[in-house]
């Protein structure tokens, strides 16, 4: 499988947020402001690629020792450690982004999209490089979904044209569903 096919497939066709419905919590929670959405997306890309770089070889070691059943626990521990590293780096080098992300930054630890991409790389039997490309593409797809949705929310949040019964969470969920449907149009691309 070519790297371009993997990238296009995971960004547009099998987008973790819009097609596989993983990572919904930060998708809905951090998409109110564009700068926070971009910051979260970049942090997720970074964590996904680092998590894949660490978990892929560790899974090979787990398989050698016949303890592959520990995969999920080990992956969660690795992801948690990486998120702590990212949080410390952001706090030191980009404090404004650290403050903007707030409670959602530690939630990357429990972002099922990060764990999902690590497990998918193993399940799909990707090589190490294919796994890195897939995780990068998954992060870019997450960022793309966040940026598009953030732009949509800027138009609908506090919009007086939205009926009272739909204001707040209902219109946000309807908008997310419509965005997901729009991405289904890429289904035959790859």
Language-model regions: role of each:
Residues 21-29, 88-93, 103-107, 112-125:
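Generic transmembrane alpha-helix signature in multi-pass membrane proteins
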Residues 1-5, 57-70, 119-132, 187-190:
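Helix-coil boundary and interhelical linker segments in multi-pass alpha-helical membrane proteins
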